[in-house]
Swiss-Prot record:
Catalytic residues as annotated in Swiss-Prot or TrEMBL: 52 (nucleophile)
Principal EC category: isomerase
Organism: Acetivibrio thermocellus (strain ATCC 27405 / DSM 1237 / JCM 9322 / NBRC 103400 / NCIMB 10682 / NRRL B-4536 / VPI 7372)
Reaction catalysis annotation: uridine(38/39/40) in tRNA = pseudouridine(38/39/40) in tRNA
Similarity remark: Belongs to the tRNA pseudouridine synthase TruA family.
Record-linked HAMAP family: TruA
Keywords from the named record: Isomerase, tRNA processing
UniProt cross-references to Pfam families, sorted A to Z: PseudoU_synth_1
Any one GO molecular-function label of the UniProt entry: RNA binding
Gene: truA
Gene3D superfamilies: Pseudouridine synthase I, catalytic domain, C-terminal subdomain, Pseudouridine synthase I, catalytic domain, N-terminal subdomain
Protein name: tRNA pseudouridine synthase A
Role summary: Formation of pseudouridine at positions 38, 39 and 40 in the anticodon stem and loop of transfer RNAs.
EC number: 5.4.99.12
PANTHER family linked to this entry: PSEUDOURIDYLATE SYNTHASE, TRNA PSEUDOURIDINE SYNTHASE-LIKE 1
């Protein structure tokens, strides 16, 4: 038996998220089917992040156990010939048997892209969140800085979260603008259900003047979901990297 680790990039537009579901096309199921076609084995592909419907990944990490004799570094080449164009195995390697993509992860980095323009982009409509309002970018930057550190993020999680604790540590946060694209990045030891999208939705309300930047600490301390902004759409969100 061998343990193979994959680093995966995918466009989540046409998938009902990562995790297998009955009667729905998912990223996990699509890759598992490709592995079965390659090795004849029915495997359980473990993903580091269970991304939602429409969310993309630049660096999803997954692993599976196999009895196949295919060298670990050749799985990427073989699987890419079998997978659809919107899923790419960027890297594959054999790892220790105790490696677990989800439970061994020490942190993750996410990116959210906003297309800030009067009119939407036909080419970027599934890869960015279109916002036509003029944004107060400096206020959004100030607001973003308040998320750094260790906090109880109850105000920034959707109902249905199975997490035992809502305390998380954010180690890095940035907000940059290049022409019409606003890029938000955030890294931390873990994220609650929809946490990144709710943070982005809150920053958007700062940008249009509905929430003041200096209100963010109060919203965090309130631990009340209704105090934060709405959940930003899935199409602008990317899983960038998983840390081990």
């Amino acid at each position: 038996m061998r343990n193979v680790k994959l680093i995966i990039e995918y466009d989540g537009t046409n998938y009902h998220g990562w995790q297998k579901q009955k009667n729905a096309k998912t990223v996990q199921d699509t890759i598992e089917r490709a592995i079965k076609g390659l090795t004849g084995e029915k495997v359980d592909l473990i993903g580091a992040s269970r991304t939602d419907f429409g969310v993309h990944a630049l660096g999803q990490v997954a692993n599976f156990i196999t009895n196949s004799g295919i060298p670990g570094d050749r799985f990427s080449y073989a699987l890419n010939r079998m997978l659809p164009d919107d899923i790419v195995i960027k890297e594959s390697q054999e790892v220790d048997m105790d490696f677990h993509a989800r439970y061994k992860a020490k942190g993750k980095r996410y990116r959210y892209l906003i297309y800030n323009s009067q009119f939407p982009s036909a080419l970027l409509r599934h890869r960015t969140y279109h916002v036509s309002h003029k944004l107060d970018f400096e206020s959004m930057q100030r607001a973003a800085s308040y998320f750094l550190g260790t906090h109880d993020f109850s105000a920034f999680r959707s109902s249905g979260s199975s997490a035992k604790t809502s305390v998380r540590t954010i180690t890095d946060v940035s907000l940059e603008r290049e022409d019409k694209i606003v890029k938000f990045e955030i890294a931390g030891d873990g994220f609650l259900y929809n946490m990144v999208r709710i943070i982005v939705g809150t920053l958007m309300e700062v940008g249009i003047g509905k929430i003041r930047a200096d209100e963010i600490p109060q919203i965090i301390e309130s631990r009340k979901r209704k105090r934060a902004g709405r959940t930003a759409p899935a199409e602008g969100l990317y899983l960038v990297e998983v840390y081990y």
